[in-house]
């Protein structure tokens, strides 16, 4: 069965994630991380797309992006991942998959929900126990905001970050927030206020992401 085309639109914020094939480690050294970020910069030069937040982890990555034209997210990601796979395999004299498949993405409402997703992304290394403070992870956008050489990759978000943003990122998120975000990641469900979620799901053909998982309950016998 052919894959259905992604329905992504312009000027909508998206969370994007992909993992190494079989969840294997992809980035083994600082050079691996830097090479991927160089490709992100090259992809931005080819297809206009704003990067609001990011976190590269050893076996996966998170991005928060805003495409400028319909379909641009798919074009941008296709170039980024296929180019990375070619260079990765050539460097290691290997063949085969590097990433587990197509990336996952879900749309985000441009309000406090966007800040919630950005916090989730920027504290990823802290949540995984790789650093004591999120800004110490060199491959995440919180470090870049605080003066890293990779600051140039970022675009200012459409809503202003609070002055205590670093402290907010380093503060734990609630279990409800994490559960909602992980559901959106797994089901590619829009993340926002209820009315916006329903409207966006209809507009983008994502109604199935709103349905409950599992079999519908049996109707009582008459």
Language-model segments: residues:
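Short Pro-Cys-Gly-centered "Cys-loop" motif that presents a nucleophilic cysteine in a tight turn
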Residues: 1-58, 66-222
């Amino acid at each position: 069965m052919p894959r259905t085309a992604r329905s992504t639109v312009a000027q909508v914020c998206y969370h994007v994630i992909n993992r190494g094939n079989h969840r294997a480690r992809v980035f083994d050294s600082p050079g691996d991380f830097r090479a991927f970020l160089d490709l992100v910069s090259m992809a931005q030069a080819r297809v206009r797309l704003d990067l609001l937040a990011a976190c590269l982890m050893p076996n996966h990555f998170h991005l928060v992006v805003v495409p400028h034209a319909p379909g641009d997210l798919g074009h941008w990601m296709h170039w980024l991942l296929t180019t990375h796979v070619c260079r990765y395999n050539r460097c290691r004299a290997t063949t085969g998959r590097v990433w587990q498949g197509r990336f996952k993405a879900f749309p985000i409402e441009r309000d406090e929900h966007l800040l919630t997703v950005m916090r989730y992304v920027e504290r990823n290394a802290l949540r995984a126990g790789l650093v004591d403070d999120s800004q110490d992870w060199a491959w995440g956008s919180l470090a870049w905001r605080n003066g890293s050489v990779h600051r140039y990759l970022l675009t200012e978000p459409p809503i202003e970050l609070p002055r205590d943003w670093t402290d907010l990122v380093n503060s734990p998120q609630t279990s409800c927030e994490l559960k909602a975000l992980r559901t959106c990641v797994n089901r590619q469900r829009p993340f926002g206020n209820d009315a916006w979620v329903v409207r966006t799901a209809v507009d983008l053909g994502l109604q199935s992401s709103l349905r409950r998982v599992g079999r519908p309950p049996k109707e009582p016998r008459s």
